[in-house]
Each structure stands twice: as structure tokens, then as C-alpha cells.
Amino acid sequence: MGVNRGAVDVILRAEQAAILATGIVLWIANGGPPPLLIPAWLLVDLSMVGYLAGPLPGSITYNAAHNLVLPVVLLGLGWWTDTGWMVLAAAVFLTHIGLDRTLGYGLKLPTDFRDTHLGRIGKG
């Protein structure tokens, strides 16, 4: 018998949407120009360049930029040292990761780009 994960999935996506919203608020509250958030946000996906060397190095570079450790450390250090660029960088990562997870894109497994910790994405 299959397990209905519906309610849990809704909660997980709501959590990620909250991370996305937090990143947007941090960006704006710390003087980040709203028109630059999306171009800055896209820079995070440069981490996919590792896939040119194969699925294992690709998953390593992608996951290094798509987990919450870096933005939380940047946010903490930026707040503690009053270093605005660190807070803005954290905001970029938080918005990117929050949106990716809200849409169902997870950390990559070393087997294939479409294999994530949230399940397989795309067709096939």
C-alpha cells in the first residue's frame, strides 16, 4: 500500500517558500536593488558547470551552491561583522534555494542530473 505524502509535501514546500520570502526581505531591507536580484540569483546556477566533467563532479559543485549551509554562514558572519555584501549574498542564495525547493528541485545525486534528494525530475 502506498503512502500519501501530500500533507508532508505541502509543509515542506511551505517551508521553502518561507526561505524564499526571507531572502527577498533580506535583500530589500539591506539595500539590494530589486532589479538586480534576479540576475544575481541566476549566478548561483553557474555551479552547474561541474556537470561538464560528469555527474559526480557536477553534483558536488551544484550541491555546494544549493544547500543552506553557505547562506546561513554568510548571513551570520555578515550580521555579526556588519558586512552588507555578505548579507546580500546570503539573500541571493536563500531566494535561489527557496525557489528551487518550492518548485521541487532538490540537491543532486551523483547518478544523473535529474536524480535529486526530492526524487527524479523531468521526463524519463
In which residue ranges do the predicted regions lie?
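N-terminal membrane-targeting hydrophobic helices
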Residues: 1-124
